[in-house]
Amino acid sequence: TIVNDGPAANGASGRSLSWLNSSRMRSAPYHRLRMAGVDRYRTLAARLPDVDWLRFDGGLTWDEDGPDNAIEDVYQYEVSIGYDARLLTPDAVAAVTPGIDAGAIAKQGAIFNPGEGWVDLPILIGVLLEEFAALGGELVKDQGAAKVLVENGRAIGAVTTSGKRFEADAVVLATGPAVPAMAAEAGQTIEDGTPVALLIQTKPLEHPLRAVLNTPRVALRPAPGGAISLDADWAADEGVTVREDGTYEIAPAVVDALLAEASSVMAGNPKLEVASIGAGGKPIPGDGEPVIGAMKAVPGCYAAFSHSGATIGLVAGELLSYEIATGREHPMLATFRPDRFSEE
């Protein structure tokens, strides 16, 4: 049983850039987990080769021009760990991947990672829920918010604000930015580094862009139907205000500025128009590393909380299911357990 406060994909999954990658630098265990995550998407893409919501057309990234430009160091690091990477001069990019304005790329060049891709999470979630239902699973979305039901020190299910109880042998907290507070209420500390994020999806347009772009001022990717999805940390920091009632106010000037940044890196600098805007918490644990596994302070309860939720989503569910079904800890999750915050 999945208990959700409203329709599926109404949280962080519905406003994610969902770039599938292990680009740049991170811990070795996190890199391995992300690569396993990308592998599962490749398997899915082979099973569904004609869909327009899961693509592996590569990723292109560059740094701002200046003394802090580290693109050469990043390239050397990626090569050293066997991560497929090509360092390109600005004028060489068009021959490798289309749709980018070479004039926007710093003179130090850009890295093209051909193995990267993107997924439209709401569509993926719909596909997975169809499989879930076919196997006898139930999605509950009309009972309000839920919390972990704890009796005699053990998680025995969930209870919603409507008073509905769902008893279970195991409970998984996979509620995005709400995980730390819900875990704390149940008795487990999980440090939280969640910022507010902003994602814009444009109206469809004809454009040759195929790769995911991660640039100094904007990240963007194609989306189904010819739209472009884009975000930037600075835009969320400057343009999103949390109201007293928990809703979000978005500054139109910042939206316009972000659209202009996106247009400036796209070939032909097309006019981009807003189709939808999403704002809300971007799930990031306090130390930046995923939190996946049993909450030892609350037997019977597990957590899945991570920044790279799209990239590792399929494999995280697989490995967590293994732990729940077998009672054995999976070695790939050894450094990601919730207990690490209680041990500090």
Question: Which residues does each predicted region cover?
Answer:
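Glycine-rich FAD pyrophosphate-binding loop
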Residues: 1-14
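Dinucleotide-binding Rossmann-like beta1-alpha1 core, especially the glycine-rich loop
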Residues: 18-96, 217-219, 246, 253
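Flavin (FAD/FMN) cofactor-binding and adjacent substrate-gating region
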Residues: 39, 63-135, 140-141, 147-154, ...
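Mid-domain beta-loop-alpha active-site segment that forms a flexible
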Residues: 110-130, 176-178, 250-261, 305-306, ...
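C-terminal catalytic lobe of FAD-dependent flavoproteins
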Residues: 121, 263-344
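Conserved beta-strand-loop-beta-strand element in the redox core of flavoprotein oxidoreductases
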Residues: 146-166, 171
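Central helical "cap/lid" subdomain
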Residues: 162-210
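Active-site lid/adjacent beta-loop-alpha segment flanking the redox-cofactor pocket in flavoenzymes
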Residues: 206-298
